[in-house]
Amino acid sequence: MKLRELVGAAVSVALLCGMAAEAVAGDRDADAVARGRYLVTISGCNDCHTDGYLQNGGKVPETEWLKGTAVGYQGPWGTTYASNLRLVIGKMSEAQWVAHARKERLPPMPWFNLAKMTDDDLKAVYAYVRSLGPAGVATPAYVAPGGKVNTPYFVFVPVVDQTQAAR
């Protein structure tokens, strides 16, 4: 065999190996995105982070998912807003997201549940949200207790029905 044919064969084998590795990596990425979509769905992320999701029985186009909302959640902690995860995660590395997901948050964010996800689960959520791409605008900033709120908001304060309390 001539040197030219040997070099050509070696280059062809190297290219095929590279393409096979890319295909395997692509399958792994697709699996992570699918797993992340599943986790986002069953964990209820859309309930707060997708505008109109609860009110419409989950019938919101996926292109609108996880953009946050300008409707606040007010309680003794002040007023918080469900962030636009597509913008937040879009600015983070995977490692930054995993660390971010483990931190305590203000109510009503169930951070204690998110923090219990495995690293692989959090990486899958990251892959899914990144696959959606950046979209929307940043949500309003936190308002401390007693501060002026310029958006609609839900009040998270228990109300005691006095007719029931008297019984």
Whereabouts are the PLM-identified features?
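Peptidoglycan-targeting cell-wall enzymes and recognition modules
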Residues: 78-93
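N-terminal secretory signal peptides that target proteins for export/translocation
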Residues: 1-7
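Solvent-exposed, polar/charged alpha-helical surfaces in well-ordered, non-transmembrane soluble domains
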Residues: 34-38, 46, 83, 95, ...
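A structural feature that tracks compact, well-ordered secondary-structure segments
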Residues: 86-90, 99-100, 111-113
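Flexible coil segments in periplasmic/lumen-exposed cytochrome c-class electron-transfer proteins
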Residues: 42, 50-80, 111-167
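Electrostatic cytochrome c docking/interface patches
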Residues: 22-41, 53-56, 94
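Bacterial N-terminal signal peptides
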Residues: 8-18
